[in-house]
Structure formats: structure tokens, C-alpha cells
Amino acid sequence: MLYNLLVSHINSCYIFSIFYNVIVRSGIAILLSFSISFSLIPILIKYFKYWKNLAQPIRNLGHKSHIAKAGTPTMGGIAIIFSIIISTLMLADYKNIYVLTTIFGMLSLAILGLIDDYQKVTKKNTKGINATCKLISQIMVSIICCMIVNYNLNSEIANHLIIPFFKKLTIDLSIFYIPFALFIIIGSSNAVNLTDGLDGLVTVPIIIVSFCLGLMCYLADNAQYININHLQILHVQQASELTVLCSAIIGASLGFLWYNIQPAKIFMGDVGSLSLGGAIGIISVISKNEIRLGIIGGLFVIEALSAIIQIYSIRYLGGKRVFKMAPIHHHFEQIGWSESKIVSRFWLLSIIFSLIGLSSLIL
């Protein structure tokens, strides 16, 4: 809104022209979303501590160190999502269909996560919403987002899929693209949700992935100014406005991380993890970086696969467990790794995956 207002008055004040620059607005978005998130979270902590029945329930089967976390407030994702939306609407072009679609998807999944969190804390169990109802809701939101994106993308690339590390190789999935895009968005949402199990664990990877996606959105939109022949990327007009949104995610997550580093004063909750995971999934679909998301977000993939493998192993191999506990970060807890050691190692893995993903732009 602020961006649109200032641009409309560019003739009366030349200095407003700097707001044409996506990089300038992205930098401001980081600072603004950080400030809002950093300021709002202490208020949430105070409020949720006052209402003690809104504390995070702890699984009885979890590591014994988690018992000390009983009573820690949850639903900190409220502050993150609020900060992102306010910053994005102020500094991005709010008429941009890709921005609006991502905000719609993120907000819808945040509401779903909020309902899930509320059921968990009020009923004092870790199950929340029925899994089938949650999945159906995610599918409905994802279908709407995919249809909007597919309709607005250039028809020459709408159903195309980039294969990283294979120069100029794209595959036209045709009618199978929408189901594939649904898998990316829903999978991303749930994978991030599964990763959110230790203090600070999911926040830094979200920041790293958002940075990579923001960069790729900028490159995708500015292909005419870059020697696109040397980059494995498709030209997506108006995608650079999503760089502002990605920057807002970075800033809001940094503000949250201040209070979420061990020992955490507040947890993100499903309201944050489901929506942020969904947002990066939607952005990857818009910018045509679906497979590349699986690389830069490799940590999320590993966490999700470990949970899937464990479930199928128990169900079809006579109760045999591949891991001591899933997702995999809990496995490392069970074999004696400290929480800080697991988190720091997983952060390093996330950095490595992001570097591999970015290298696929030029290799």
C-alpha cells in the first residue's frame, strides 16, 4: 500500500523513485517485519503465560529433556504471519497477483494451524485436528492457489518443470502439473511442520530457504537484464515482488528467533510452521523452482522422509523401527545428542543444501 501510494506521487517528489527498486523495498521489509515481530512476541508471551491453559502440550513419549518445556507458550507464529502480511502489503505491490495468492495461501494455512494449535492446548493433547480434515483443508487451499498461479503464468512455461543440473532441460507435465504442484505445496507445509520440534530448529532453515527463493524470484523477473542463457531459470514476469515477501519472512523469522533459541520462551506452533511451509511451496511453484526447493530445503525433505519411513516400517514390517524416534531430530536426541548440538548441525546442513541449490542455477 505504501509502495503504491509513493509510486503514484513520484512526479511530485523524485526521492520516491527509489521505491521502484525491489532490493531497497526488500531491505526495508526485513527491518520492518523484524521490528513488528520482535515487539509483538513479548506481548504474546505475556498473554499466553497469563492464560496458562494455552501452553504447549508435551508428548509423553518424547525425550525426557522436553519435560522441562511444559508450560512454554505456543502459537508464536501469529506474530510472524502478522508481521509478514503487514510488511508485504506496505512495501510490495498489493495488486500483484502472485503476492496476493501467496498471502491468501499463507493466511489460510495459518488459520488452519491456529485451529489445530487451539485444539491441542485446550484439550491438552498433541493430536489437534483430525489428520484427514487437515489434509483436505490443505488440498483445498493448494488447489485454489495452483489454479490462480497456473492461469496467470505465461502459457509457455505454466506447466513446465526445470530439472536442476541439466542445462536447459525442462519437462512439460501438461495435465499432471497441477497434481505435482499440489504435492509440492502440501509436502512443503507438512515437512516444515515436522521439522519444528526443537528450539530454533526450523527458524533458521526457513530464513535460508526464503533468502534463496527471494533471490531466484528476483532473477526470474529480471531475466531481460541478466544473461539468462547462463542461468537455469525461467522468465516469470512480476515475480520479483515476491522478493519483498521473502524478505518479510526473513525479518519476521529473525524477530521470532530471538525468543525461540534454546531455551525457547515461545514456540512457533502449527499456525507458523504450516503457513510458512505452505508459503515457500507456493513461491517455488510461482517462480518455477519446484524441484530446486527440494534441494535448498533438503533438511525439510530429510525430516519428512524419516517420518514416512518410520510409519511404513512400523505398519508393514511387524512394528520394526528404522529410527529410535521420528522425525529424525528426535532420533539423535534418543542416542544422546544434546539439543544445541542437533540444532547447530542441522543449521549447517541447511546452509550446505542451500549452496547446492543455488549452484544449480549456473551448473
Swiss-Prot record:
Alphabetized GO MF terms: metal ion binding; phospho-N-acetylmuramoyl-pentapeptide-transferase activity; UDP-N-acetylmuramoyl-L-alanyl-D-glutamyl-meso-2,6-diaminopimelyl-D-alanyl-D-alanine:undecaprenyl-phosphate transferase activity
Keywords annotated in UniProt: Cell cycle, Cell division, Cell inner membrane, Cell membrane, Cell shape, Cell wall biogenesis/degradation, Magnesium, Membrane, Metal-binding, Peptidoglycan synthesis, Transferase, Transmembrane, Transmembrane helix
Family classification: Belongs to the glycosyltransferase 4 family. MraY subfamily.
Membrane-spanning intervals of the chain: 4-24, 28-48, 72-92, 96-116, 129-149, 169-189, 200-220, 241-261, 266-286, 294-314, 342-362
A cellular component annotation (GO) from this entry: plasma membrane
Origin species: Orientia tsutsugamushi (strain Ikeda)
Pathway(s): Cell wall biogenesis; peptidoglycan biosynthesis
GO biological process annotation, one example: cell division
E.C. no: 2.7.8.13
Record's subcellular location: Cell inner membrane
Membrane topology term: Multi-pass membrane protein
Official protein name in the record: Phospho-N-acetylmuramoyl-pentapeptide-transferase
PROSITE patterns the record matches: MRAY_1, MRAY_2
Cofactor(s) needed by this chain: Mg(2+)
Catalytic activity: UDP-N-acetyl-alpha-D-muramoyl-L-alanyl-gamma-D-glutamyl-meso-2,6-diaminopimeloyl-D-alanyl-D-alanine + di-trans,octa-cis-undecaprenyl phosphate = di-trans,octa-cis-undecaprenyl diphospho-N-acetyl-alpha-D-muramoyl-L-alanyl-D-glutamyl-meso-2,6-diaminopimeloyl-D-alanyl-D-alanine + UMP
Record flagged with keyword Membrane: yes
Job of this protein: Catalyzes the initial step of the lipid cycle reactions in the biosynthesis of the cell wall peptidoglycan: transfers peptidoglycan precursor phospho-MurNAc-pentapeptide from UDP-MurNAc-pentapeptide onto the lipid carrier undecaprenyl phosphate, yielding undecaprenyl-pyrophosphoryl-MurNAc-pentapeptide, known as lipid I.
Family matches, as InterPro entries: Glycosyl_transferase_4 (IPR000715), PNAcMuramoyl-5peptid_Trfase (IPR003524), PNAcMuramoyl-5peptid_Trfase_CS (IPR018480)
Domain of life: Bacteria
HAMAP family: MraY
